């Protein structure tokens, strides 16, 4: 009998789940985390689906697996897993992983209060504030973000023509701002946004190409960001980020906030040093800031940072036994 055991630490970042896999991870081949990610997807994607999909996970589940870094300037490497695949970078996942990893001794930074992690998208610098054994806040300085395309259009049944900008913040995001056929996310239910997101994402991916100019392995539009006016004091904007097949991010979305800041910076509405507090669909806040200007393959870009908090909710030992369990590798109800 072959039974695989995965000890996990469960938690959430500003309301969105994070499952940190504390053991049982496979050895991966590759000179970089981007190459290791490709190996994982080729041979071990059943681990992702088994841990993220029902019956062990759910539509909003996301997680991370720790690895030794391939580069000397990083303390640890992170592979992100979720229902939609293995993201190059995940902001809320990073905040949760760092928080629970440090609190449980899985991550030991060389310099207390700061560390660098290797992600498939590149190096991410981290600062964290710890009080006793608890990590109270994590700020990550993300990979460069940039506006990729403006004014793209697609037809969405039930709404009509929708115009979006697409920006990169670690993943590609179609940003839907107030317009003729969409006034504010507050006018609609999460279920409506999910249904429209599936149509919009498919239409945009069919009509346009989305490829990172320096990392062609990062391609395709994966996320839809619906926007609206803030409802929490201090917030500058509100969002509902769609990912996977049925998920709306409960957090303000770290890479989505990075992409939004890149879009606003390209329009001249944010500059270096400016803060951007982003409100989620449930009212939690990420504190964004533009740390520096940058360029990506000749494009104007920014170096964004995101601050947020996470809490551990429990310990979980998960079994995957394909010989006895017909749903060992998970399932999705569509």
From Swiss-Prot:
Disruption phenotype: Cells lacking both hpbD and hypF are unable to utilize tHyp-B or t4LHyp as sole carbon source.
InterPro entries listed in its UniProt record: Pro_racemase_fam (IPR008794)
E.C. number: 5.1.1.8
Any GO BP: amino-acid betaine catabolic process
This protein's UniProt keywords: Isomerase, Plasmid
GO molecular function: 4-hydroxyproline epimerase activity
Active site: 90, 253
Quaternary state and interactors: Homodimer.
Protein family per UniProt: Belongs to the proline racemase family.
The protein's role, per its UniProt record: Catalyzes the epimerization of trans-4-hydroxy-L-proline (t4LHyp) to cis-4-hydroxy-D-proline (c4DHyp). Is likely involved in a degradation pathway that converts t4LHyp to alpha-ketoglutarate, which would allow P.denitrificans to grow on t4LHyp as a sole carbon source. Also seems to be involved in an alternative catabolic pathway that degrades trans-4-hydroxy-L-proline betaine (tHyp-B) to alpha-ketoglutarate; this pathway would permit the utilization of tHyp-B as a sole carbon and nitrogen source.
Name the UniProt record assigns to this protein: 4-hydroxyproline 2-epimerase
């Amino acid at each position: 009998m072959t039974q695989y055991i995965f000890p996990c630490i469960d938690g959430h970042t500003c309301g969105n789940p994070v499952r940190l896999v504390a053991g049982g991870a496979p050895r991966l081949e590759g000179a970089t985390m981007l190459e290791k990610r490709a190996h994982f997807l080729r041979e071990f994607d059943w681990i992702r689906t088994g841990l993220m999909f029902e019956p062990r996970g759910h539509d909003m589940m996301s997680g991370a697996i720790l690895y030794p870094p391939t580069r000397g300037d990083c303390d640890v490497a992170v592979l992100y897993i979720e229902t939609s695949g293995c993201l190059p970078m995940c902001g809320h996942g990073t905040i949760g992983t760092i928080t629970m990893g440090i609190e449980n001794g899985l991550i030991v930074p060389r310099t207390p209060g700061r560390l660098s992690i290797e992600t498939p998208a590149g190096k991410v610098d981290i600062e964290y504030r710890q009080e006793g054994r608890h990590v109270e806040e994590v700020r990550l300085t993300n990979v460069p973000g940039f506006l990729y395309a403006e004014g793209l259009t697609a037809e969405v049944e039930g709404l009509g023509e929708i115009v979006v900008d697409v920006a990169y913040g670690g993943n590609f995001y179609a940003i839907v701002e107030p317009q003729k056929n969409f006034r504010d996310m507050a006018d609609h239910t999460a279920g409506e946004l999910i249904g429209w997101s599936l149509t919009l994402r498919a239409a945009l991916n069919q009509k346009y190409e989305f490829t990172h100019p320096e990392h062609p392995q990062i391609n395709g539009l994966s996320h839809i960001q619906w926007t609206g006016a803030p409802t929490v004091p201090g917030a500058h904007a509100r969002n509902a980020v769609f990912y996977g097949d049925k998920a709306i991010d409960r957090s303000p979305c770290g890479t989505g906030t990075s992409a939004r800041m890149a879009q606003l910076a390209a329009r001249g509405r944010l500059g270096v040093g400016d803060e951007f507090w982003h409100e989620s669909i449930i009212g939690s806040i990420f504190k964004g800031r533009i740390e520096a200007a940058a360029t990506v393959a000749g494009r104007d870009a920014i170096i964004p940072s995101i601050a947020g908090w996470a809490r551990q909710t429990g310990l979980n030992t998960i079994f995957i036994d394909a010989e006895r369990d017909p749903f060992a590798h998970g399932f999705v109800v569509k």
